[in-house]
Regions:
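Short functional hotspots at interaction and active-site rims
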Residues: 1-187
Length: 187
């Protein structure tokens, strides 16, 4: 049974269904930038443009550390409606696989209106343990490789850069960032 007390389908035949262990999270990307370290000529002080415009978009992501496969959507909000869209699209992307997905306990992950597809099973990591969710390091990588020391003139430019940076992630990079021996030994 799942957390709502409803029957969940069992994996019909493990030899014919691929089981994936994926880790899911969301992160905000917006027009508020954070200056990072940078190179500059000796004896000079670096100058980095900065502004504080509170406009955001949210990247929803799921990664599979064993293979380095990943799935991302950029959404306007962090809420149950967007989470339902994410789960539906993830399920459509892997229709013949059974996905066991670890995630934090955000309110929209446990909402009564959350629609969990039949080929996805959710489980929650303990509160205040981001180190147990390897996708957290993917967000750091995206910020470091796509958002350092730059201002964006519009929210659309933020989304463009976010999509470009996500598309630059390959399986080997995702695997190297999300590799945890305790995950791989469990799979």
């Amino acid at each position: 049974m799942n957390r709502r007390g409803e029957e969940r389908r069992c994996i019909p035949n493990v030899s014919t269904v691929r089981v994936r262990l994926m880790f899911q999270d969301e992160a905000s990307f917006g027009r508020i930038n954070k200056p990072k370290y940078c190179w500059c000529p000796k004896g000079t002080r670096p100058s980095v443009p900065c502004h504080h415009i509170r406009e955001y978009r949210y990247a929803y992501g799921a990664v599979e550390p064993q293979t380095g496969e990943s799935f991302f959507l950029v959404m306007p909000y962090c809420n149950t409606e967007c989470m339902n869209i994410f789960l539906r699209e993830l399920s459509k992307t892997y229709p013949n696989d059974y996905i066991i997905m670890a995630m934090d306990g955000a309110a929209w992950h446990k909402s009564g209106t959350l629609e969990i597809p039949d080929n996805i099973e959710l489980f929650y990591i303990p509160p205040a343990t981001p180190e147990m969710n390897p996708i957290e390091q993917i967000w750091s990588w995206l910020r470091m490789h796509g958002f350092c020391n730059e201002i964006f003139v519009s929210l659309e430019k933020v989304v463009e850069r976010l999509c470009e940076t996500i598309c630059s992630l390959d399986h080997a990079t995702v695997r190297s960032i999300t590799h945890r021996s305790w995950i791989l030994s469990a799979v």
